[in-house]
Structures are given as C-alpha cells and as structure tokens.
C-alpha cells in the first residue's frame, strides 16, 4: 500500500503556539478488496491487514483524538467477498478499523435498499448522504444529511454527496427516492454547519467523481475540503477550485481498491 501525505497548510486557521493538527485518513472505492492483490502489477499490495497496521501507526503517532478515518463510498462490490457473503464482511472490516464517517457510493445499492439497510444497521460509522431524499424508503433514519465529529479540539462537519444513481443502478431501486442538486444541498448544509453548529471546518465526502467535484466546488460556499471517490482518480497532490466567494476548495481522491491510503494533515 502506498501512503500519500498531503499537508493542507492553506487551510490553517489562526495558527499559533496553541495550534492543533488534525490528521484525516481517507479511502474510496475499496470495492470489497479485503485481501492484498493476488495478481497483476500490484500483487501483495493493499488489504485489510495492511490498512489496519497503517491506521494504527497513525493513531499511535498523532493520538487517536486527533485522527479521523473516513470513506468516500463504494466500499462494497468488486470481489467474491461481496457476492458470496452479501456485503457482511466489508461491514465487519470497517468496524474493526474504526471508521468515523462514510458516504454512500452507487455500488452500495447493488443488492437493493432492504439489503443495504440491513448492512447499515450493523455499521458503527456515521453514514452521510445529503442529495437524496430517503423518506419512506428502508434507508430512512439510517442515513444522515450531515454530521459533526469532534477531533483535535475542533468541530468538523461532514456532508455526503452521491452521484445520480439513475445512470448506474437498476431503475426499480433508483426510483425509490429523489435525487437533489448536490451544490444546492451542500450550500444549505455548509452554512448550517458553519453558522448554526459552529464547525471549524466543513468537509464533503463525495461520490460524484473528480470532474463533477470540480464543477460542484465552483458553485459552493463554506466548504473547505472535498474528499472524493467514484471516478477512481489518483491525485498525488491537492487540487484546488475557487468557490463562489473566491476561496480555495481543496479536492483529494485516492484511486481504488485500497491500493493507496490518503493522509491529510490540517493545521488550525
């Protein structure tokens, strides 16, 4: 597994003698790759054991209270673990690793919403997805539009965004709920998180894809960081897009299959 470290000094807020450093470990599109790669160019790389060792080392070095572990969607589907065990082992692995916040990816819906709801009931992490109305579906009450987590003495707000699944999921599943405009919803919730909840930082966990992340970022306010997925894009360094107020929105994404681990260091 390759470790990609990005220091977001540009997000420093009033750095001084009492400055805090938050570390965010992020994955996306792991697609049920619980084991290391068994063949090909990346044989032996990735897998839950390697991930656990890396995560534990970061928590030990930085202090668990200063570390967040997040996933930007599509943790399931892609190996026989999903097809044979109905997505159960992925939930067990994520619980063992101690994920804090997860957003939904389109492949989470592959077995239908009843099965997804069953799995999410067993997931310890907060699950966020803001741009769908799940009212009346099995996911109602299991998925939040946004959430707040305290780490490194700061309040971090999370918003989840998901691609239009009508393009990639069975129509009978996609028609169970309503798709909402990602930028419009993100702006509403980001303002709420900053002004009403007093968040020091607002992060979008996005399963829109890199190109759409850039488009949405340009239509946002009050969002500091987008941790992306869906397009399996490998970004070796941060990308920035100016928002509606001319402020930089940082975008990161971490390829696929758990071959890389993203590590963001944010100084406040």
Positions of predicted regions on the chain:
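Sec-dependent N-terminal signal peptides
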Residues: 4-13
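Sec/Tat signal peptide C-region and signal peptidase I cleavage site
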Residues: 13-19
């Amino acid at each position: 597994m390759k470790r990609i470290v990005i220091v977001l000094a540009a997000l420093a807020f009033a750095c001084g003698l009492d400055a805090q450093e938050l570390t965010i470990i992020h994955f996306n599109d792991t697609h049920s790759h619980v084991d290391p790669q068994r063949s090909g160019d990346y044989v032996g790389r990735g897998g839950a054991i390697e991930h656990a060792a890396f995560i534990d080392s970061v928590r030990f070095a930085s202090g668990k209270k200063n570390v967040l572990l997040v996933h930007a969607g599509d943790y399931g589907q892609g190996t026989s673990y999903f097809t044979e065990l109905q997505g159960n082992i992925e939930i067990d692995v994520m619980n063992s690793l101690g994920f804090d916040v997860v957003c939904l990816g389109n492949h989470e819906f592959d077995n239908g919403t009843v099965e997804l709801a069953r799995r999410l009931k067993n997931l310890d992490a907060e699950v966020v997805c803001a741009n769908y109305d799940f009212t009346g579906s099995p996911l109602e009450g299991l998925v939040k539009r946004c959430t707040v987590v305290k780490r490194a003495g700061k309040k971090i707000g999370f918003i989840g965004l998901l691609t239009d699944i009508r393009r990639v999921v069975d129509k009978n599943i996609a028609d169970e709920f309503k798709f909402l405009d990602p930028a419009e919803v993100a702006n509403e919730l980001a303002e709420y998180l900053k002004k009403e909840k007093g968040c020091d930082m607002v992060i979008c966990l996005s399963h829109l894809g890199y190109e759409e992340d850039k488009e949405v970022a340009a239509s946002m306010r009050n969002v500091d960081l987008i941790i992306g997925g869906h397009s399996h894009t490998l970004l070796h360094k941060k990308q920035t897009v100016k928002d509606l107020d001319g402020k930089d929105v940082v975008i990161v994404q971490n390829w696929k299959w758990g071959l890389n681990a993203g590590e963001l260091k944010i100084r406040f």
